[in-house]
């Protein structure tokens, strides 16, 4: 190592130490002065991890639900370095937080870690930049556009059926199949075609991984896991970001591939759109209706003010955003739906009978939406098994959050609002709200599609963008692609439940949920195999 390199490392070390000391002082002051310290909650378990290790050691929402039962609707617990975090299931408070997206934003730590992988896409940016991107992207996710994409959903769902039939032919009936694997391949293929007209061809039995597929696999894996120390330190202490590590190198290499191929796609699509605008006839087919093409068309509109246009970099950042947001969530939601159907065979059969009442294998979006029991099954799956169980916001300014239900603070005083200081983190408990007995009744933990025939009045206050639940959040940062996800999920369930009968391949107690950004199934006795959902599958034969 040269003298210059040593000097650079020493300088970085000194800078990192100075930043760390400064941040530690600021954090100590914040902990000591935060109004959250007066809110009741569980005792601190560890100075470094706070209560986070307890949370990650249990299934999503289980520990939180226990805390609510013991300490009430509004509590605090400890996060990284014992910092206070607000936790509330008060629907008025949550509505206030979600509707004031400028005042309550994603934490810098989460934005850095996600941004390192995804770039400055819609999931990451805040404020005016978010509004600008969303304004351009909204039309691409409207009902008319999703209606045009339904053909892709149905086609890929049928291809997954062929994929599993091939597995069954090899091993006999019923075949033990990891359904999560096939569903992940299918949703990746869908978002490739529907997102930017790119064929990943993951469901091709004889296919080989392509360059872009491999790059995104690296990016997906980098988002998994808990307590990766150096990436966490880099997020907290910016000078450390200048020191390369193995994870950063892998991400940089994958992003280089994504950038090169993404810019090729964008350049090609822009040229096609401009040629069409110049008078050449554009083909009216699905290939010209993918989300990226619609985004570029909207961005090139002649009536769009120049200040509202996105740069090519902003457009490029949406490619990995489409993939991450539209791939993992839908595949895991559908996997949990199939799991729920194995635990309620009468529901599975009732659903199958409704699906067979449609005299086509290629339903339209409207036909899928006209199936009431399918709608109820999807709603109940998203309620009980929300793919994203929680999220975090941070107060960007001192504020007072209103409450429906007052709480008693640690000094015995009744409080009808929550005071927060700038920098205070707030946990948004998506799954806890979805499974709240106070809102949904004593059977809230149970999978019962029939509950959607008449829902309790209390759930009308849940601040969700869809179906009186929090699964797609609410407010200005509600999931922009919820219609896309729901129709894709319906197309999958339609094809799969018509084609196959499903049973769980292991005892129910063997299945657990991994606590990560997305809820993934695991088998307790096969943890070394990673996330999986093994089901016994056999073809369904109509009588």
UniProtKB/Swiss-Prot annotation:
Bilayer disposition of the protein: Single-pass membrane protein
Enzyme class: oxidoreductase
Entry protein name: Cytochrome P450 monooxygenase 205
Organism annotation: Postia placenta (strain ATCC 44394 / Madison 698-R) (Brown rot fungus)
Pathway of action: Secondary metabolite biosynthesis
EC number: 1.-.-.-
Name of a matching Pfam family: p450
Residues given in the record as heme binding sites: 479
């Amino acid at each position: 190592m040269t003298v210059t390199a040593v000097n650079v490392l020493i300088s970085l070390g000194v800078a990192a130490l100075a930043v760390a000391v400064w941040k530690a002082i600021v954090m100590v002051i914040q902990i000591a002065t935060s109004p959250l310290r007066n809110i009741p909650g569980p005792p601190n378990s560890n100075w470094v991890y706070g209560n986070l290790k307890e949370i990650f050691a249990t299934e999503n929402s289980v520990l939180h639900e226990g805390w609510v039962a013991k300490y009430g609707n509004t509590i605090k617990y400890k996060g990284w370095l014992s910092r206070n975090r607000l936790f509330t299931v008060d629907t008025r408070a949550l509505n206030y937080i979600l509707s004031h997206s400028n005042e309550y934003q994603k934490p810098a730590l989460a934005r850095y870690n996600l941004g390192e992988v995804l770039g400055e896409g819609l999931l990451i940016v805040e404020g005016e930049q978010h509004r600008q991107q969303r304004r351009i992207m909204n039309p691409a996710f409207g009902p008319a556009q999703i209606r045009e994409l339904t053909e892709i959903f149905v086609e890929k769902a049928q291809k997954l059926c062929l994929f599993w039939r091939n597995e069954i032919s090899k091993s006999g009936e019923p075949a033990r199949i990891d359904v999560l694997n096939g569903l992940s391949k299918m949703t990746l293929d869908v978002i490739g075609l529907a997102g930017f007209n790119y064929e990943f061809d993951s469901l091709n039995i004889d296919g080989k991984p392509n360059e872009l597929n491999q790059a995104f696999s690296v990016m997906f894996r980098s988002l998994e896991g808990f307590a990766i120390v150096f990436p966490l330190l880099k997020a907290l202490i910016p000078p450390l970001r200048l020191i390369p590590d193995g994870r950063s190198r892998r991400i940089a290499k994958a992003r280089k591939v994504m950038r090169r191929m993404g810019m090729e796609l964008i350049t090609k699509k822009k040229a096609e759109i401009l040629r069409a605008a110049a008078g050449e006839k554009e083909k009216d087919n699905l290939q010209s209706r993918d989300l990226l093409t619609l985004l570029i068309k909207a961005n090139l509109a002649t009536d769009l003010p120049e200040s509202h246009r996105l740069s090519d970099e902003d457009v490029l950042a949406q490619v990995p955003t489409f993939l991450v947001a539209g791939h993992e969530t839908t595949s895991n939601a559908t996997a949990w739906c199939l799991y729920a159907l194995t635990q309620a065979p009468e529901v599975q059969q009732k659903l199958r009978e409704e699906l067979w009442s449609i005299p086509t294998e290629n339903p339209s979006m409207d036909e899928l939406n006209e199936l009431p029991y399918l709608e109820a099954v999807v709603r109940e799956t998203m309620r009980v098994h929300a793919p994203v169980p929680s999220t975090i916001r941070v107060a960007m300014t001192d504020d007072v959050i209103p409450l429906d239900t007052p709480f008693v603070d640690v000094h015995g005083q009744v409080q009808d609002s929550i005071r927060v200081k700038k920098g205070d983190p707030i946990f948004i408990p998506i799954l806890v709200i979805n499974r709240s007995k106070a809102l949904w009744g004593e059977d809230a933990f149970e999978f019962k599609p029939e509950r959607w025939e008449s829902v309790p009045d209390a759930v009308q206050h849940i601040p969700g963008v869809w179906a009186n639940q929090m699964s797609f959040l609410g407010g200005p940062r509600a999931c922009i692609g919820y219609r896309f996800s729901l129709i894709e999920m319906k197309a999958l369930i339609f094809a799969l439940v018509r084609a196959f009968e499903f049973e769980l391949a292991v005892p129910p107690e063997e299945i657990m949920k991994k606590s990560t950004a997305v809820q993934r199934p695991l088998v307790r006795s096969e943890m070394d195999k990673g996330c999986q959902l093994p089901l016994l599958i056999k073809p369904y034969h109509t009588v």
